[in-house]
A protein has these predicted regions:
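Aromatic- and charge-enriched surface segment that lines or borders ligand/interaction sites
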Residues: 95-139, 155, 161, 289
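Surface-exposed binding/hinge segments that line
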Residues: 109, 143-185, 205
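Gly/Pro-rich hinge or "lid" segments in bacterial periplasmic/extracellular proteins
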Residues: 167, 175-224, 228
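Ligand-site clamp/hinge motif
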Residues: 217-262, 386
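Periplasmic-binding protein-like
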Residues: 262, 286-328, 371-372
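Structural transition elements
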Residues: 314-351, 368-371
Length: 425
């Protein structure tokens, strides 16, 4: 039976204010494999997965976004620790570890007999190289997760000691994310197309924005769940669901059109749950008119999050109440900081002298973003903004222009914090 999985269906429209949460199934890093529970005979199967989050490169040391880790983590790359489905830190390539009384020294005991796909042995030396590479070479902003590290030492082939500058509540967790991916010095020449890791798969073919083919490799220390895995990229959810119903793919994840769940054929299983991602509307407070907090507050009051939920997500989203914190977060509080109040929005604009303020909303070329942008255009225009909608190709242009260069006034994105990526997919 083919499986339709709403791996990221909705999203919380958290406006510097906010709106809703996303429907999705929970899994490990990716929908492709679960190496911890695979049976010995399951590796005779193949699997084709559909996604609308296309990877243009396989090098997440230089390229931001979740599309690359979604495919590579746990499949090609592995980490010293893993984040399981309930958010607990569990053994990975490290079988155990100790933390010093001052919470600054971590001693990891590494799994023996592990090799990289190029034949190199996984040792404490390669683990130290991987951590230092993040600190010294990565240009992806998530490399900041390694800022707490002061020194890394391989005390023997299977013992790694990491000394932090000061105690960190988040550092060990980050070692289960993409920043904790274990690499080898001999595998760095072609990260964009031929990554080398300790995972059950290696990349057999990659066509940017089209597909990634993974083939189970010889010598893996565990048991892969499928012999061959293909991740096919589609321009939108509708085309990916059509491919599922035609038998062209086995799994669809990242569904951002929940109404499609009503139309799938009998015999196709669906799963819907709550994700830890949210749809964020971001206002650049370094640029007018959003350098005035009253204008930002006016936007928050102008957005009818309940209407957005009903119109865009069939009422399946969770309203985060104006805060960019998903309900899966232990610090989530079910409060409404900015209730819909267009009169209050107009009042704030008048106080700020910003009536008729011209703003550009730059949206990534993703189906949900374009739909949300049209609704926001209507709601913001109603309270007195003059809105221009602009599109930025995603990921190539949007990541560089908006996320990287901060060259925007207002933008939106379905977002997940780097610390939450391991439990999103």
């Amino acid at each position: 039976m083919r499986r339709f999985c709403a791996r990221r269906a909705l999203g919380s429209l958290a406006m510097a204010a906010a709106v809703g949460t996303v429907s999705a199934c929970s899994a490990g890093h990716t929908a492709v494999v679960d190496t911890s529970q695979a049976s010995s005979d399951s590796a005779s199967t193949s699997l084709t997965v559909a996604s609308t989050s296309a990877a243009t490169s396989l090098d997440f040391t230089t390229t931001g976004g979740a599309a690359i880790p979604a495919v590579l983590m746990d499949n090609v790359y592995e980490t010293l620790v893993r984040i399981d489905e309930d958010g607990s830190i569990t053994p990975g390539l490290a079988t155990s570890w100790e933390i010093s009384d001052d919470a600054r020294s971590y001693t990891f005991h590494l799994r023996k007999g592990v090799t990289f796909s190029n034949g190199d042995a996984f040792t404490a030396g390669t683990a130290a190289f991987s951590i230092n590479y993040v600190r010294e070479k990565w240009t992806n902003g998530i490399s900041a997760a390694m800022d707490p590290v002061a020194k890394v030492t391989a005390t023997d082939d299977h013992t790694l000691k990491v000394r932090l500058k000061q105690p960190s509540n988040g550092w060990l967790w980050s070692m289960g994310t993409a920043t904790g991916a274990m690499m080898t010095p001999n595998g760095m020449d072609n990260l964009a197309a031929q990554p080398v890791g300790t995972g059950p798969y290696e990349v057999s073919r990659f066509a940017p924005s089209e597909f990634v083919e993974l083939h189970v490799r010889d010598g893996y220390w565990g048991k892969p769940a499928a012999q061959d895995v293909t991740v096919r990229y589609f321009p939108d959810t509708i085309s990916s669901v059509n491919a599922l119903q035609a038998g062209g793919v086995d799994v669809v994840w990242g569904v951002q059109n929940p109404e499609l769940l009503d139309d799938v054929k009998e015999g196709i299983a669906t799963e819907v749950g709550t994700t830890n991602g949210e749809v964020l509307l971001s206002m650049n407070n370094a640029r007018a008119p959003f350098d005035d907090p009253r204008v930002r507050q006016a936007v928050a009051y102008a957005v009818d999050r309940s209407a957005a939920n009903d119109i865009l997500w069939n009422g399946m989203a969770k309203d985060t109440g104006g805060a960019p914190i998903p309900p899966t977060d232990p610090w989530f509080e079910d409060k409404h900081y900015y209730d819909y109040d267009p009169d209050k929005a107009r009042q704030l604009l008048a106080e700020a002298g910003a009536e008729g303020a011209e703003i550009a909303l730059t949206t990534p070329t993703l189906p949900y973003a374009q739909t949300v942008a049209e609704l926001l255009y209507s709601q913001l225009t109603e309270v007195g903004f003059k809105v221009t909608l602009e599109s930025a190709e995603f990921p190539a242009v949007w990541l560089g222009q908006v996320m990287g260069a901060k060259d925007y006034q207002m933008s939106l994105i379905s977002h997940v914090e780097p610390r939450d990526v391991p439990t999103l997919f």
